[in-house]
Amino acid sequence: MEMIKMKRFKTPISVLLLIQFVLLHLNISAQERLTLLGNRFLTFSTVVRVNQIETSRDQFHGTDESGIHSPEGARKFRETIENSWPGARITWSFSWLALKDQRPNYVDLRKLVVSYHKKYGDEITFLPGGYFANMYNTREQVNRDLHEGLQMVSEMVGGGYRPKSVIAGFLAAENQQYLAEKEGIHVCQGNIWSQYAVDNGDGEGSISYPYYPSREHFCKPAQGKKDMIDCVNLDGWTVDFLNARYPVPRFINGIRCGSRQGVGPIETILRQGTEIGTSEMLATTAAHFDTGFALNKFAWVTSIWEMSLVEAYKVYGYNGRNGLDGLEIWLKEIRRRWPQAKCITQGEFGMLWREQYKNNDSINYQFVQRGSGICGSEAEMEIKWFMNKDFRMALLRDWKANSPEKLIDFTRYDLKAVEPED
């Protein structure tokens, strides 16, 4: 009889211990769970393509880049990232032609990138129309390309894989709505902030941090529930706010200074050299990870680094540079100065933002940046940006001379906006 009592006593104790263990584990997991607020994020993406600008499935402009896409180049690129930031997760995007190409270098390259998904947790996704899909295709055609391109990515990776985001350069509101409602993808790099008179396409008037786009226009933050597309619209490159005032490249002290100067490689490391280039990249990063973090309670820096750049000096010159030395310096210095910063995929970041913000009502971004002294980022100038659902506004002043602030941009979002027709 006593033995029976002991057995009855032991069973409840073991259950209680199990419950205690589970609760402890859940508590630890909750503490470790990544949140948007309180963190600094870097999202780093790359593009695998065949031609410089692939305007449609079978048409393209610019240079044939097939000779500078190789598994060796991709391996060197990915190992540089892992050595500089162990555990970093990046996003790979493939163009239509890069998914279809059966030449050995592309077959092997696709296999290698799939192995990085398995090894590092990298995201693999699709790039429609070489950043400018809507300039060369109807919205209906872009939707077809998105559907079939994403299918090809899933088949390439296998195991029911599905990316959380798409890289698109610029993407019309209707196409972002299609992604959310038909493809179940709620994150899109569908906006290149303040890109004007650069490359083959423009997009001007948006805010630079994440937002839900309006059904009227991809650059306009949604004004309400009926207007909102449930697809987090992301910028492609974090730029120096001061340098971005200039619409076209200018030569300053013999250096070609582009308006896209910030953390992208072409306008910094490749044109200006490693020392000056990384100095600008870190100055732009600090504007977000220091002052921006204090103002917004989180910070985000993002860059798309085309895979072709690893060997692009063979075609475009770039003074013989591939930028990997600068990439290593930049990533290592970020980790040294902001050791708690997270490098996660574009899809992961967008979904964290989506968890925090259910609409645009409470977004209230503020930025303050003083010039780096490089190119158009004048050392004596200070710019302030205010960005929310209702408007964006920029104030400029000479902080060394303590001059009054000058209003240089005020864009209202309560006004109707219309995208160009197909």
Segments from the language model and where they lie:
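Metal-dependent polysaccharide deacetylase catalytic core of the NodB/CE4 family, i.e.
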Residues: 88, 93-170, 229-265, 296-314, ...
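Well-ordered, non-membrane alpha-helical segments in soluble/globular domains
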Residues: 63-79, 104-113, 140-149, 274-291, ...
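Active-site-adjacent pocket scaffolds in enzyme catalytic domains
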Residues: 32, 165-294, 370-375
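N-terminal secretory signal peptides that target proteins for export/translocation
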Residues: 1-11
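Active-site beta->alpha N-cap acidic-glycine motif
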Residues: 32-112, 297-302, 309-310, 381-389, ...
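C-terminal domain-boundary segment and adjacent tail
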Residues: 187-207, 260-393
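Acidic-aromatic substrate-binding/catalytic surfaces of carbohydrate-active enzymes
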Residues: 397-422
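Bacterial N-terminal signal peptides
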Residues: 15-25
